[in-house]
A protein has these predicted regions:
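Core-facing hydrophobic residues within beta-strands of well-ordered domains
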Residues: 87, 112-113, 256
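Active-site loop/oxyanion-hole signature of alpha/beta-hydrolase fold enzymes
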Residues: 50-97, 101, 107-109, 126
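N-terminal cap/lid segment of alpha/beta-hydrolase-fold proteins
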Residues: 1-10
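Conserved serine/cysteine hydrolase catalytic core
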Residues: 156, 177-254
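Conserved HGGG/HGGXW glycine-rich cap/lid loop of the alpha/beta-hydrolase fold
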Residues: 9-58, 108
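The conserved beta1-alpha1 loop
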Residues: 23-27, 95, 120
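Catalytic active-site module of serine/aspartate enzymes centered on a nucleophile-bearing elbow/loop
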Residues: 244-275
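Flexible "cap/lid" loop of the alpha/beta hydrolase fold
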Residues: 107, 117-153
Length: 275
Protein backbone atom coordinates (compact mmCIF):
# COMPACT_ATOMS: atom_id res chain seq x y z
CA UNK A 1 0.00 0.00 0.00
CA UNK A 2 1.34 3.42 -1.00
CA UNK A 3 0.02 6.96 -0.72
CA UNK A 4 1.17 9.77 -2.98
CA UNK A 5 0.10 13.39 -2.65
CA UNK A 6 -1.43 14.78 -5.83
CA UNK A 7 -2.49 18.42 -5.59
CA UNK A 8 -2.38 18.09 -1.82
CA UNK A 9 -4.62 15.00 -1.61
CA UNK A 10 -3.25 11.60 -0.44
CA UNK A 11 -4.02 9.15 -3.26
CA UNK A 12 -4.03 5.45 -2.41
CA UNK A 13 -2.03 3.22 -4.82
CA UNK A 14 -1.53 -0.56 -5.01
CA UNK A 15 1.09 -2.30 -7.18
CA UNK A 16 1.20 -6.06 -7.81
CA UNK A 17 2.96 -8.42 -10.18
CA UNK A 18 5.78 -8.09 -12.68
CA UNK A 19 6.12 -7.34 -16.37
CA UNK A 20 4.79 -4.56 -18.61
CA UNK A 21 2.79 -1.95 -16.71
CA UNK A 22 -1.00 -1.98 -16.69
CA UNK A 23 -3.23 0.56 -14.89
CA UNK A 24 -6.70 -0.47 -13.72
CA UNK A 25 -9.03 2.49 -13.19
CA UNK A 26 -12.41 1.79 -11.58
CA UNK A 27 -15.77 3.28 -12.46
CA UNK A 28 -17.86 5.91 -10.70
CA UNK A 29 -17.78 5.53 -6.94
CA UNK A 30 -15.77 2.30 -7.00
CA UNK A 31 -12.60 1.30 -5.13
CA UNK A 32 -9.32 -0.46 -5.78
CA UNK A 33 -10.62 -3.76 -4.38
CA UNK A 34 -13.24 -4.02 -7.12
CA UNK A 35 -10.40 -5.28 -9.34
CA UNK A 36 -9.44 -8.03 -6.85
CA UNK A 37 -10.76 -10.92 -8.99
CA UNK A 38 -8.65 -9.70 -11.94
CA UNK A 39 -5.33 -9.13 -10.18
CA UNK A 40 -4.25 -12.73 -9.41
CA UNK A 41 -4.97 -13.69 -13.03
CA UNK A 42 -3.13 -10.69 -14.47
CA UNK A 43 -0.21 -10.20 -12.07
CA UNK A 44 1.88 -13.12 -13.43
CA UNK A 45 1.98 -11.28 -16.77
CA UNK A 46 1.81 -7.58 -15.88
CA UNK A 47 2.80 -5.04 -13.25
CA UNK A 48 -0.70 -4.12 -12.12
CA UNK A 49 -1.29 -0.61 -10.79
CA UNK A 50 -4.54 0.27 -9.01
CA UNK A 51 -5.52 3.51 -7.34
CA UNK A 52 -8.40 5.36 -5.70
CA UNK A 53 -9.51 8.75 -6.91
CA UNK A 54 -9.96 11.45 -4.21
CA UNK A 55 -12.69 10.58 -1.74
CA UNK A 56 -12.92 6.97 -2.92
CA UNK A 57 -11.42 3.85 -1.37
CA UNK A 58 -8.66 4.94 0.99
CA UNK A 59 -7.75 8.21 -0.73
CA UNK A 60 -8.16 11.54 1.02
CA UNK A 61 -11.05 13.97 0.71
CA UNK A 62 -11.39 15.61 -2.71
CA UNK A 63 -10.38 19.26 -2.72
CA UNK A 64 -11.60 20.13 -6.22
CA UNK A 65 -14.31 19.14 -8.66
CA UNK A 66 -13.26 16.31 -11.00
CA UNK A 67 -12.34 17.21 -14.57
CA UNK A 68 -11.34 15.01 -17.49
CA UNK A 69 -7.92 16.59 -17.89
CA UNK A 70 -7.35 16.47 -14.15
CA UNK A 71 -8.08 12.74 -14.05
CA UNK A 72 -5.76 12.05 -17.00
CA UNK A 73 -3.02 13.96 -15.21
CA UNK A 74 -3.76 12.02 -12.02
CA UNK A 75 -3.09 8.76 -13.87
CA UNK A 76 0.24 10.18 -15.02
CA UNK A 77 1.17 11.04 -11.43
CA UNK A 78 0.07 7.60 -10.24
CA UNK A 79 2.32 5.99 -12.85
CA UNK A 80 5.20 8.18 -11.73
CA UNK A 81 4.68 7.08 -8.14
CA UNK A 82 4.50 3.43 -9.21
CA UNK A 83 7.89 3.70 -10.91
CA UNK A 84 6.53 3.81 -14.45
CA UNK A 85 7.80 7.19 -15.62
CA UNK A 86 7.66 8.78 -19.04
CA UNK A 87 9.94 6.12 -20.55
CA UNK A 88 7.71 3.19 -19.55
CA UNK A 89 4.53 2.95 -21.67
CA UNK A 90 1.52 1.46 -19.88
CA UNK A 91 -1.71 -0.20 -20.93
CA UNK A 92 -4.66 1.83 -19.65
CA UNK A 93 -7.76 -0.07 -18.52
CA UNK A 94 -10.82 2.00 -17.69
CA UNK A 95 -14.19 0.73 -16.47
CA UNK A 96 -17.39 2.73 -16.97
CA UNK A 97 -16.72 6.44 -16.25
CA UNK A 98 -12.98 5.74 -16.03
CA UNK A 99 -13.11 4.83 -19.72
CA UNK A 100 -13.33 8.59 -20.30
CA UNK A 101 -10.26 9.16 -18.13
CA UNK A 102 -8.14 6.47 -19.76
CA UNK A 103 -9.01 7.56 -23.29
CA UNK A 104 -8.12 11.13 -22.35
CA UNK A 105 -4.77 9.93 -20.96
CA UNK A 106 -4.07 8.05 -24.20
CA UNK A 107 -4.72 11.20 -26.22
CA UNK A 108 -2.82 13.58 -23.94
CA UNK A 109 0.12 11.26 -23.16
CA UNK A 110 0.55 9.08 -26.28
CA UNK A 111 4.23 8.47 -25.54
CA UNK A 112 3.24 6.91 -22.21
CA UNK A 113 0.47 4.70 -23.60
CA UNK A 114 1.03 1.16 -24.90
CA UNK A 115 -2.63 0.27 -25.31
CA UNK A 116 -6.18 1.15 -24.26
CA UNK A 117 -8.82 -1.25 -22.92
CA UNK A 118 -12.31 0.10 -22.22
CA UNK A 119 -14.35 -2.21 -19.99
CA UNK A 120 -18.07 -1.59 -20.54
CA UNK A 121 -17.12 2.05 -20.85
CA UNK A 122 -19.49 4.97 -20.54
CA UNK A 123 -20.62 6.19 -23.97
CA UNK A 124 -21.99 9.63 -24.84
CA UNK A 125 -22.40 10.14 -28.58
CA UNK A 126 -23.43 13.81 -28.51
CA UNK A 127 -22.96 15.26 -25.00
CA UNK A 128 -24.24 18.75 -24.25
CA UNK A 129 -22.97 21.15 -21.59
CA UNK A 130 -25.01 21.43 -18.40
CA UNK A 131 -27.31 24.37 -17.87
CA UNK A 132 -26.45 26.58 -14.89
CA UNK A 133 -23.45 24.47 -13.82
CA UNK A 134 -22.58 26.73 -10.87
CA UNK A 135 -26.06 26.30 -9.41
CA UNK A 136 -25.96 22.54 -10.01
CA UNK A 137 -22.58 22.29 -8.27
CA UNK A 138 -23.87 24.27 -5.30
CA UNK A 139 -26.87 21.93 -5.02
CA UNK A 140 -24.59 18.88 -5.20
CA UNK A 141 -22.35 20.25 -2.46
CA UNK A 142 -25.34 21.15 -0.25
CA UNK A 143 -26.87 17.71 -0.74
CA UNK A 144 -23.63 16.03 0.30
CA UNK A 145 -23.33 18.20 3.39
CA UNK A 146 -26.95 17.63 4.40
CA UNK A 147 -26.78 13.85 3.98
CA UNK A 148 -23.44 13.64 5.77
CA UNK A 149 -24.72 15.69 8.70
CA UNK A 150 -27.71 13.36 8.93
CA UNK A 151 -25.36 10.36 9.21
CA UNK A 152 -26.47 8.74 5.96
CA UNK A 153 -23.03 7.46 4.87
CA UNK A 154 -22.45 5.56 8.10
CA UNK A 155 -26.02 4.28 8.29
CA UNK A 156 -26.60 3.32 4.67
CA UNK A 157 -23.29 3.53 2.76
CA UNK A 158 -22.29 -0.16 2.90
CA UNK A 159 -25.87 -1.30 2.26
CA UNK A 160 -26.21 0.92 -0.80
CA UNK A 161 -22.84 -0.30 -2.05
CA UNK A 162 -23.93 -3.94 -1.72
CA UNK A 163 -27.22 -3.18 -3.47
CA UNK A 164 -25.49 -1.41 -6.36
CA UNK A 165 -23.03 -4.27 -6.84
CA UNK A 166 -25.80 -6.88 -6.94
CA UNK A 167 -27.64 -4.77 -9.52
CA UNK A 168 -24.47 -4.41 -11.61
CA UNK A 169 -23.72 -8.14 -11.80
CA UNK A 170 -25.26 -10.85 -13.94
CA UNK A 171 -25.35 -13.09 -10.91
CA UNK A 172 -23.94 -13.06 -7.40
CA UNK A 173 -23.42 -10.50 -4.70
CA UNK A 174 -20.59 -8.29 -3.54
CA UNK A 175 -17.39 -10.33 -3.01
CA UNK A 176 -15.56 -7.51 -1.21
CA UNK A 177 -14.84 -8.10 2.51
CA UNK A 178 -17.27 -6.19 4.70
CA UNK A 179 -14.52 -4.45 6.67
CA UNK A 180 -13.14 -2.93 3.47
CA UNK A 181 -16.61 -1.92 2.30
CA UNK A 182 -17.36 -0.30 5.65
CA UNK A 183 -14.02 1.50 5.66
CA UNK A 184 -14.49 2.88 2.14
CA UNK A 185 -18.23 3.51 1.99
CA UNK A 186 -19.22 4.76 5.46
CA UNK A 187 -17.60 8.18 5.16
CA UNK A 188 -18.68 11.66 4.15
CA UNK A 189 -15.63 11.88 1.86
CA UNK A 190 -17.03 9.00 -0.19
CA UNK A 191 -20.49 10.57 -0.38
CA UNK A 192 -19.11 13.92 -1.52
CA UNK A 193 -16.85 12.19 -4.07
CA UNK A 194 -19.54 10.04 -5.66
CA UNK A 195 -21.96 12.97 -5.86
CA UNK A 196 -19.25 15.11 -7.45
CA UNK A 197 -18.34 12.43 -10.01
CA UNK A 198 -21.98 11.96 -10.91
CA UNK A 199 -22.63 15.70 -11.04
CA UNK A 200 -19.64 16.36 -13.29
CA UNK A 201 -20.21 13.33 -15.54
CA UNK A 202 -21.66 15.35 -18.40
CA UNK A 203 -18.87 17.92 -18.19
CA UNK A 204 -16.29 15.18 -18.63
CA UNK A 205 -18.19 13.74 -21.59
CA UNK A 206 -18.17 17.18 -23.23
CA UNK A 207 -14.45 17.54 -22.51
CA UNK A 208 -13.76 14.18 -24.15
CA UNK A 209 -15.81 15.03 -27.24
CA UNK A 210 -13.74 18.20 -27.64
CA UNK A 211 -10.48 16.30 -27.11
CA UNK A 212 -11.44 13.72 -29.73
CA UNK A 213 -11.82 16.51 -32.26
CA UNK A 214 -8.37 17.92 -31.51
CA UNK A 215 -6.07 15.05 -30.57
CA UNK A 216 -5.98 11.77 -32.55
CA UNK A 217 -5.23 8.32 -31.15
CA UNK A 218 -3.03 7.46 -34.16
CA UNK A 219 -2.30 3.72 -34.32
CA UNK A 220 -2.80 2.89 -30.65
CA UNK A 221 -4.12 -0.65 -30.00
CA UNK A 222 -7.65 -0.32 -28.57
CA UNK A 223 -10.00 -2.99 -27.24
CA UNK A 224 -13.58 -2.30 -26.19
CA UNK A 225 -14.90 -5.04 -23.89
CA UNK A 226 -18.69 -4.90 -23.70
CA UNK A 227 -20.92 -6.70 -21.20
CA UNK A 228 -23.95 -8.58 -22.50
CA UNK A 229 -26.64 -10.30 -20.42
CA UNK A 230 -28.90 -11.25 -23.31
CA UNK A 231 -31.98 -9.54 -24.69
CA UNK A 232 -31.69 -6.13 -26.35
CA UNK A 233 -28.46 -5.49 -28.24
CA UNK A 234 -28.76 -1.70 -28.10
CA UNK A 235 -25.91 -1.35 -25.60
CA UNK A 236 -23.72 -3.68 -27.67
CA UNK A 237 -24.42 -1.56 -30.73
CA UNK A 238 -23.27 1.57 -28.90
CA UNK A 239 -20.11 -0.20 -27.74
CA UNK A 240 -19.48 -1.40 -31.29
CA UNK A 241 -19.75 2.15 -32.62
CA UNK A 242 -17.32 3.28 -29.90
CA UNK A 243 -14.81 0.62 -30.95
CA UNK A 244 -15.13 1.63 -34.60
CA UNK A 245 -14.73 5.30 -33.74
CA UNK A 246 -11.50 4.57 -31.87
CA UNK A 247 -10.19 2.21 -34.55
CA UNK A 248 -10.34 -0.63 -32.07
CA UNK A 249 -11.64 -4.16 -31.65
CA UNK A 250 -14.91 -5.09 -29.93
CA UNK A 251 -14.96 -8.07 -27.58
CA UNK A 252 -18.12 -9.25 -25.84
CA UNK A 253 -18.23 -10.67 -22.32
CA UNK A 254 -21.32 -12.83 -21.85
CA UNK A 255 -23.15 -13.44 -19.71
CA UNK A 256 -21.96 -10.47 -17.70
CA UNK A 257 -23.41 -7.42 -16.03
CA UNK A 258 -21.85 -3.97 -16.05
CA UNK A 259 -19.33 -5.08 -13.40
CA UNK A 260 -17.49 -7.33 -15.82
CA UNK A 261 -14.43 -7.56 -13.58
CA UNK A 262 -16.56 -9.33 -10.97
CA UNK A 263 -18.66 -11.52 -13.28
CA UNK A 264 -15.98 -12.58 -15.78
CA UNK A 265 -12.51 -11.49 -14.66
CA UNK A 266 -10.79 -13.82 -17.13
CA UNK A 267 -12.46 -11.94 -20.00
CA UNK A 268 -10.93 -8.71 -18.69
CA UNK A 269 -7.49 -10.34 -18.46
CA UNK A 270 -7.77 -11.79 -21.97
CA UNK A 271 -8.72 -8.37 -23.35
CA UNK A 272 -5.70 -6.77 -21.66
CA UNK A 273 -3.21 -9.41 -22.74
CA UNK A 274 -4.61 -9.35 -26.27
CA UNK A 275 -4.27 -5.59 -26.68
Amino acid sequence: MTFVRILGVPNHIRVDGTGPVCVLSAGLGMAWFDWDPVVPLLAPHRTVVRFDRPGLGLSGHARAWPTLTGEAERIARVLDAAGAGAGVPATLVGHSLAGFHCEAFARLFPERTAGLVLVDSSVEEAPRPRRAPEFADACTRACGTLLSTAGVPRALGPFLRRTAVRAGRHTGGDPAPYDLVRRAYSTSRFLHAVLAENGRYRDQAVELASLRGRVPLDTLPVTVLAAYEGGSRHWLDRQRVLAERLGGVLRVSAPAGHLVMLDRPQDVVDAILGT
